[in-house]
């Protein structure tokens, strides 16, 4: 997904007795490091502790003219804490980074402005005052290297801002009477910011009847072109799924949903008599929304957290087996094309007493992955995060499918932590997968939102 550019406020500090040219040069280099990393800055010149407080007032006014996701509080040297607090207090509602710069080597000697004297005098003070911030610092061996940590936290700040505006649509409620998918709307809105809206299956069923045949045929042609079927299907076999996709997308557009969860087993399969895998695929790939089955509200919120941090799809997977050093994850329905290795592959399959429907049997990309899940217990929210190496699984099948059983989209994830440790912390059957090492960004986002990481 396309991510908007991050905007950060930036204010530097240095004592009035420190060489002004040196303070300005250090702040400009820090500024350049962030801008080279892609951040847009609302910049104000460095502030000193002048007795009249003129620099403080100027910085507050200049920062107030901009709108930013976070404020970078950059100490280029020692500064009395009251000067910093006076400048940043009007922005206490914003996430912040306390960034201590470092001295420089000049002809073999270290020349320092006591940057970490300033940050060490502020870290606990800012914590005590309730600022939501991350503390990072440079070393003489690696000046401005902490810029990468600032950028990581900035990505978390952007994600937090997007979550405050996010909305999840949920067709039906509590599929299969599951407990692990339940949520508390008020605490979720307070902690994360996401609003979850429920709508009825009947509304979608009625809207499906209103879909024009002329709207179905073009999408059917796209599907037949983009998906590889094991055997050519009849367009009529695809019609119900296309109608449902168009009906749900109308609701998505009306209400501005960024994620969708549908009542699957007790809804689409039981009442409409077809498996909704195809609907989820279209919603993810054509509609551009996060998708997860079974009314999994916190699973959908976890997807949004991953999407807003990384720009990735945030595909859901569920656990099939725990092994000695790995876990088998897979899905009995679909994966978004963003995680498919090669072309999307589907077949017409029958499971149990359900009518035949589209089943995704694509091969899933391997590599370094993160698996994470948000859960709540009362007002307390927790995020379980594990990392590992995803590999192509051995031959396996899920009991219940008509033979020959399909090869479901799946991975074996060799965990970086012992499986037993993972198992004793697991929070539900659905976890959200992302590629690369996203642990730091997830940690930062949870820290910002007050979510415990386990």
Labelled PLM ranges:
Residues 55-68, 85-88, 245-254:
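Short, well-structured alpha-helical segments in soluble
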Residues 3-8, 41-42, 104-233:
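Cap/lid and interdomain-hinge subdomains that line or gate substrate/regulatory clefts
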Residues 222-309:
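Long, internal scaffold/assembly segments composed of regular secondary structure
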Residues 356-454:
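Extended hydrophobic packing segments that form well-structured cores
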Residues 1-35:
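N-terminal basic/disordered segments at the start of proteins
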Residues 287-399:
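C-terminal catalytic subdomain
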Residues 68-77, 97-99, 257-262:
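Periplasmic-binding protein-like
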Residues 87-113, 121-127, 132, 281-295:
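Short, acidic/small-residue loops that bind anionic groups at enzyme active sites
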């Amino acid at each position: 997904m396309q991510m908007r550019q991050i905007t950060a406020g930036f204010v530097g500090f240095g004592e009035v007795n420190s060489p002004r040219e040196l303070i300005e040069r250090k702040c400009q280099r820090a500024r350049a490091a962030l801008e080279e990393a892609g951040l847009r800055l609302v910049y104000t010149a460095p502030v000193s502790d002048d007795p009249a407080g003129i620099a403080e007032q100027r910085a507050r006014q200049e920062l107030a003219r901009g709108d930013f996701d976070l404020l970078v509080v950059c100490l280029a040297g020692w500064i009395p804490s009251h000067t910093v607090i006076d400048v940043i207090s009007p922005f206490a509602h914003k996430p912040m980074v306390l960034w201590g710069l470092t001295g420089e080597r000049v002809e073999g000697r270290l020349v320092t402005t006591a940057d970490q004297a300033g940050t060490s005098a502020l870290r606990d003070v800012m914590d005590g005052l309730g600022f939501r911030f991350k503390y990072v610092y440079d070393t003489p061996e690696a000046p401005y290297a902490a810029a990468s940590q600032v950028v990581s936290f900035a990505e978390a700040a952007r994600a937090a801002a997007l979550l405050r505006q996010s909305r999840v649509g949920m067709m039906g409620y509590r599929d299969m009477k599951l407990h692990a998918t339940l949520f508390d709307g008020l605490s979720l809105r307070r902690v994360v910011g996401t609003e979850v809206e429920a709508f009825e299956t009947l509304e979608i069923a009625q809207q499906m009847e209103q879909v024009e045949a002329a709207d179905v045929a073009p999408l059917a042609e796209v599907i037949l072109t983009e998906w590889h079927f094991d055997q050519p299907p009849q367009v009529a076999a695809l019609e119900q799924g296309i109608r449902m996709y168009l009906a749900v997308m109308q609701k998505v557009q009306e209400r501005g949903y960024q994620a969708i969860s549908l009542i699957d087993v007790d809804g689409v399969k039981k009442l409409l008599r077809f498996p909704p895998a195809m609907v989820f695929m279209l919603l993810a790939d054509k509609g551009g929304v996060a998708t997860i089955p079974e009314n999994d509200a916190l699973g959908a919120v976890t997807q949004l957290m991953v999407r807003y941090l990384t720009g990735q799809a945030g595909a859901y997977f569920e656990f099939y087996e725990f092994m000695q050093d790995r876990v088998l994850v897979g899905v009995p329905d679909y994966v978004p094309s963003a995680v498919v290795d090669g072309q999307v592959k589907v077949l017409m399959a029958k499971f149990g007493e359900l009518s035949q429907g589209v089943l995704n049997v694509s091969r899933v990309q391997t590599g370094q992955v993160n698996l994470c899940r948000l859960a709540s217990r009362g007002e307390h929210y927790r995020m379980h995060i594990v990392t590992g190496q995803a590999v192509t699984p051995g031959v396996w099948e899920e009991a219940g499918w008509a033979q020959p059983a399909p090869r479901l989209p799946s991975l074996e994830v060799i965990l970086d932590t012992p499986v037993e440790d993972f198992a004793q912390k697991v929070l539900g059957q659905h976890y959200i997968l992302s590629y690369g090492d996203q642990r730091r960004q997830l940690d930062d986002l949870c820290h910002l939102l007050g979510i415990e990481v386990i």
